[in-house]
Structure formats: C-alpha cells, structure tokens
C-alpha cells in the first residue's frame, strides 16, 4: 500500500506558483464570496484566503448575511465581473435555500469562474476542450494526484461513488476525457458492490463516514477518498482506511489527501484566469 500524499504535492504546487508570482507585474486576485455564517464554510473560505497569501496572491473575502436578497448577491457578482483587477470569483457553496445556486453560477463571468461550475466551463469539459476550460477544483486535484504517482487512466475501470454537481459529475467527464471506462454510483444504484468490486480506481465522494468497506474493493485497487465527516470529534472519510489500506495499491488519507489538492488547484485556476486576462 502506498499513500497518495496530497499534502506534499499541494505544497510543491504552491511553491511553484509562489515562484512564478514573484515575476508578475501585478498579483493575481481572488474574491471569495460567503453567504451566511456556516462554520464549516467559514473554515473553508479562510483556508482559501490564507492559501492566496501563502503564494503572494491578492484576495478579498466578501461576506453577506444568510438572509441577503438574491438580487443583492447577483448584483454584487456582476460588479466583480466588471472589476479589471479581479481575476477569480468564487462563491462558497452551499447557499441558503432562498438563493438559486444555478443563477449565482450563471452570473459569474466564465473567464473568472475559477470553481469551473459555469455552464460554459462545464461545456468545455464535456467537449474535451480542457486547455481553455476551468476544471472544477476537486476533480482537477484528483487528476494531478494520479499524475504525480504515474497512475494512468487509459482503459482503466473507474468507479465514482457519488453523483454530485461539485465532484461526481465533472469528475466522471474528466476521467472519460482521459479514456477511462467510467461508472457512477448514486443513491438509486441497485448494487453498488457490483461496480466498486471491479474498479481499478475507486473514488468515493458522498460524505457518508466509512461507507466503503474492504469487501467492496478489489485487491490492488487505487482508492481515492473525497469524503470528509466528523465522527467523535475526529475527521474521517468515506473509506474504512484501516482495512482497505491492506488491499489497495494506493490510497488517499483523510485528512491530507484530496483536501489540500482542492485548494492548490483553486490557486492554479486563479493563476490561469490571470494569464488569460493579460
């Protein structure tokens, strides 16, 4: 069993970005928009703002009360679209129920959509125009982690557990672009084990603690755990790490696997947005 160490790769990516930023005429700028006071979201956005500082980016955190009117938020995003010095705009998800996530995403200028969720960027991902797309951060982080350990996707059976908008759906399309044979399991999948057991690469993104047990995984599989939950005050993933690490050829830890890569790829996307704008 080998550990897919997202923490060390993210550190390397951040170091390379920091060196590059030193030679730029102006600092790339990311604006993070947070609606409400959800503690987990607050931790995530503070991590993103800190990561910007670590590599020499400029950043701005715009916070709104949870009962902010949808139009007020949309108009704020439109004003950020117009600001020449803003390269990336990220609206932290989830949003309160009275605000349409789709409307918010659609309002972000696609050239500043560093989360990669705008239909234009999703369309480029779907069509295979990866060079010009902003690929959503977690799927991109997973791909870079696989690359770092020379894990080829071509012809591999990839099973993704979780069909969410943020990870599962875009990840399935990204894997297809690299010639993997992809199956996606969700809450209506009748026999998940039938799919997980044949996977060369198994990726779980459900947020259900210890959902993936050792009997669901084939010997020598690569196992990537995107899930993050708290159980008895401890951060855990979707995967029963102790038992599955005995069977897997490679496995990500939680924490220290996919999480740091998601932040590192946000920085990569922001730098890409900056370069496309100059």
Curated annotation (Swiss-Prot):
Pfam families linked to this entry: THF_DHG_CYH, THF_DHG_CYH_C
Listed name of the protein: Bifunctional protein FolD
Protein family: Belongs to the tetrahydrofolate dehydrogenase/cyclohydrolase family.
Keyword 4Fe-4S included in the entry's annotation: no
Binding positions (NADP(+)): 162-164, 228
Cited function: Catalyzes the oxidation of 5,10-methylenetetrahydrofolate to 5,10-methenyltetrahydrofolate and then the hydrolysis of 5,10-methenyltetrahydrofolate to 10-formyltetrahydrofolate.
Species name: Hydrogenobaculum sp. (strain Y04AAS1)
Catalytic reactions on record: (6R)-5,10-methylene-5,6,7,8-tetrahydrofolate + NADP(+) = (6R)-5,10-methenyltetrahydrofolate + NADPH; (6R)-5,10-methenyltetrahydrofolate + H2O = (6R)-10-formyltetrahydrofolate + H(+)
GO biological process: L-histidine biosynthetic process; methionine biosynthetic process; purine nucleotide biosynthetic process; tetrahydrofolate interconversion
InterPro entries, per database record: Aminoacid_DH-like_N_sf, NAD(P)-bd_dom_sf, THF_DH/CycHdrlase, THF_DH/CycHdrlase_cat_dom, THF_DH/CycHdrlase_CS, THF_DH/CycHdrlase_NAD-bd_dom
């Amino acid at each position: 069993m080998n550990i897919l160490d997202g923490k060390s790769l993210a550190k390397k990516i951040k170091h390379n970005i920091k060196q590059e930023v030193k030679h730029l005429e102006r600092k790339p700028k990311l604006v993070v928009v947070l609606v409400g006071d959800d503690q987990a979201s607050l931790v995530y956005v503070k991590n993103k703002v800190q990561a910007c500082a670590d590599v020499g980016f400029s950043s701005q955190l715009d916070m709104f009360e949870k009962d902010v009117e949808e139009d007020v938020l949309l108009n704020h995003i439109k004003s950020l679209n117009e600001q020449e010095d803003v390269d990336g705009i990220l609206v932290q998800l989830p949003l309160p129920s009275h605000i349409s996530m789709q409307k918010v995403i659609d309002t972000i200028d696609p050239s500043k959509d560093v989360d990669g969720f705008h239909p234009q960027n999703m369309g480029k991902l779907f069509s295979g125009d990866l060079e010009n797309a902003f690929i959503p951060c977690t799927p991109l982080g997973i791909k870079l982690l696989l690359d770092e350990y020379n894990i080829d996707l071509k012809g591999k059976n990839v099973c993704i557990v979780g069909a969410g908008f943020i990870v599962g759906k875009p990840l399935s399309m990204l894997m297809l672009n690299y010639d993997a044979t992809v199956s996606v399991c969700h809450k209506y999948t009748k026999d998940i084990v039938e799919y997980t057991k044949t996977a060369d690469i198994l990726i779980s993104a459900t947020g259900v603690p210890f959902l993936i047990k050792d009997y669901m995984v084939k010997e020598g599989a690569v196992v990537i755990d995107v899930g993050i939950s708290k159980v008895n005050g401890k951060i855990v993933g979707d995967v029963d790490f102790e038992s599955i690490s005995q069977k897997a050829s490679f496995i990500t830890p939680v924490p220290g696997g996919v999480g740091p890569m998601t932040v590192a790829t946000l920085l990569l996307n922001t730098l890409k947005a900056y370069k496309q704008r100059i």
